[in-house]
Amino acid sequence: MSFTDPIGDMLTRIRNASSARHEKVLVPASRLKVRIAEVLREEGFIKDFVLHEDGVQGAITIVLKYSADREPAISDIKRVSKPGLRRYVATDSIPRVLNGMGVAILSTSKGVMVDREARKQKVGGELICTVW
């Protein structure tokens, strides 16, 4: 478990569980992680998630999504902005992931959102990760 990069830890758990064809994955909770899970659900990369409150930190159970032949909905998920090297992008330099087939998740002043929404609202921010 990585205490220096909790978002990277969450993404790695999702990537590993997905490649091992697990149905669910449990990650420690935070507001940012919950919002990332919401974005992944809205974009159709995960089925659902459940937030477990325990009074301290809580946990998130993420239900992974697979096709009929058990191929994961998430082909790859990569951390872009890391604690040692933050990556911020302006509106005009938000990357297109696989020419629009994937999404980039950004943390902006208007909340956590995907690249299309950030371009539409004309906001830049920290490029958290890319998913396809």
From Swiss-Prot:
<dbReference type="GO" id="GO:0019843">
    <property type="term" value="F:rRNA binding"/>
</dbReference>
<keyword id="KW-0699">rRNA-binding</keyword>
<dbReference type="InterPro" id="IPR047863">
    <property type="entry name" value="Ribosomal_uS8_CS"/>
</dbReference>
<protein>
    <recommendedName>
        <fullName>Small ribosomal subunit protein uS8</fullName>
    </recommendedName>
</protein>
<comment type="function">
    <text>One of the primary rRNA binding proteins, it binds directly to 16S rRNA central domain where it helps coordinate assembly of the platform of the 30S subunit.</text>
</comment>
<dbReference type="GO" id="GO:1990904">
    <property type="term" value="C:ribonucleoprotein complex"/>
</dbReference>
<dbReference type="GO" id="GO:0006412">
    <property type="term" value="P:translation"/>
</dbReference>
<comment type="similarity">
    <text>Belongs to the universal ribosomal protein uS8 family.</text>
</comment>
<keyword id="KW-0687">Ribonucleoprotein</keyword>
<keyword id="KW-0689">Ribosomal protein</keyword>
<dbReference type="InterPro" id="IPR000630">
    <property type="entry name" value="Ribosomal_uS8"/>
</dbReference>
<dbReference type="GO" id="GO:0003735">
    <property type="term" value="F:structural constituent of ribosome"/>
</dbReference>
<keyword id="KW-0694">RNA-binding</keyword>
<comment type="subunit">
    <text>Part of the 30S ribosomal subunit. Contacts proteins S5 and S12.</text>
</comment>
<dbReference type="GO" id="GO:0005840">
    <property type="term" value="C:ribosome"/>
</dbReference>
<dbReference type="Pfam" id="PF00410">
    <property type="entry name" value="Ribosomal_S8"/>
</dbReference>
<dbReference type="InterPro" id="IPR035987">
    <property type="entry name" value="Ribosomal_uS8_sf"/>
</dbReference>
